[in-house]
Amino acid sequence: MRIAVKRMCGAAAALAVACMASGVTAHPPSVSRVPQQVGELEDVITMRLEGSVVVDPAGKVVSHTLDTKLDENLAGLVRKAVAAWTFTPPVIDGNPATVRSKMWITLAGRELASGYEVRIDNVNFYNPPDPKNAAAPDKPRIQLTSIKPSPKYPKYNVNGGITLLVRFSPDGEVADVAATQCSLYFAGGRATDKVAACQAMISNATSAVRKWRATVPAELARAPGGLTGTLPFQYIGLQGAELVAASGEPGQWRRESRTRYAEPAWRDDGTQRVGSSDVADGALRTASTPLRLNAGAIGKVL
């Protein structure tokens, strides 16, 4: 399921929200009041990479692949970093296990006088359906059943995205929702207007999502973190839409002005961090994975 929300409010068609506007510079509306809950934005370049990893019962990396085509120097640095990762020994159904998983790696570069310093910004682990085994039963997942009202487009002409951490109740109502991060893509304008644009995007999406509903399988309702997922929203303008789409592809750099990632107090310990820099679509991302990276991997300079 996908959602397409135009500026005047469009029809539901996907669990992605694309809010349409014109322009890519954060311009203030007629009355501008910047709420305090959004802090200063940092300017970075980001890139998403696809790959896979095999982790043994001791938490060591047995093998790994990097599927995204990269400059060989950068690819070599990423492979070296992944090979050195260590994990909390993985457990499945109470037993030590070897785990094979797909992964998304997010790189972030910050400009220095001598160039860009690139770090591993985040890693997400997931297992997509096997297209070669169509007969395999679908894994239980949360299904959105009502996605109204649609978020209103803010009074700023921007391209950007936010991520909301959503916790459902077993009966499918939204129990908690909190914004975790906001990114503006290739945005100009004053810093205060960028902050206000992020605040408006967050406020509008949060207000709408509180009224949404879902079907929650009983199996997930009993599982740690099973009621929680990250819901990305994208606000894409008529100007710059192609650039934003292209820069969201794996292996491409995207310029962002973003808030710091923030977690609500109610976040489940097992929930994966998924921020606005980690996504290029609007799919609901749930928390389930037996892999837990040990400290030191995230934030490591390549």
Predicted regions and their residues:
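Charge-biased low-complexity segments
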Residues: 2-3, 23-302
